[in-house]
Design a protein with these regions (language model features):
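Conserved alpha-helical scaffold segments that buttress catalytic/binding sites
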Residues: 1-198
Length: 198
């Protein structure tokens, strides 16, 4: 979803705001910069950001990945370093606080002309809150931290958002679906408008 959506976002921003660059705020338990893997298609959920970078839609320095944890293979980490991707691990979030992390991102971009796209992989949230995803991970964000991050990100020029990796069929309680809906509702209720004047 993110690969196609962001390509459309990129084209729309470049057409309407040619003076602006584009960036992504990426909430995820994983880096999603893998290369080829077994018999996976050319674009799959594990390589989305590598493809966007390699296909010329995204500068690695404008990608902010928030919440990765667990095993990070050396070749993926080397790719992150090579492309200048901004990485904020789950452990860093626990030590610094999500609001401080987001404020760091805002500070880095305060003098730049960038329209941001938020992509929220639901497995960024801790597995004790989210059951309806194919790759749950412990030690993730709480729903409160996610909501606080969205509230704080309003200081940036955010013009688009998606929520991915949600599979309600894996959660009989439907709590994962409700949580995802709440996050999207809060995003809309906060009145994000890409920095446009009301």
């Amino acid at each position: 979803i993110t690969y196609g959506s962001f390509r459309g976002f990129y084209r729309a921003i470049k057409e309407k705001f040619p003076q602006y660059d584009v960036g992504i705020i990426h909430f995820d338990a994983h880096l999603d910069v893998e290369d080829e893997y077994l018999n996976m298609p050319e674009v799959w959920h594990g390589n989305v950001f590598r493809k966007l970078i390699e296909d010329g839609y995204l500068d690695g320095g404008n990608l902010y990945t928030i919440g990765p944890r667990g095993v990070i293979y050396s070749q993926w980490f080397k790719y992150v370093q090579k492309k200048g991707i901004n990485l904020y691990t789950s452990n860093q979030i626990k030590l610094k606080g999500i609001k401080n992390i987001i404020n760091e991102i805002i500070e880095k971009n305060k003098n730049k002309k960038i329209k941001f796209y938020i992509t929220f992989d639901i497995d960024c949230l801790d597995s004790s809150y989210i059951f309806g995803t194919g790759t749950p991970q412990c030690n993730g964000l709480t729903p409160y931290e996610a909501d606080e991050a969205l509230r704080t990100l309003k200081k940036l020029e955010v013009a688009g958002m998606d929520i991915v990796e949600l599979n309600p069929k894996l959660d009989d309680s439907h709590s994962s679906f409700v949580t995802a809906c709440e996050l999207l509702y809060h995003f809309l209720a906060l009145g994000y408008n890409g920095g446009e004047k009301d």
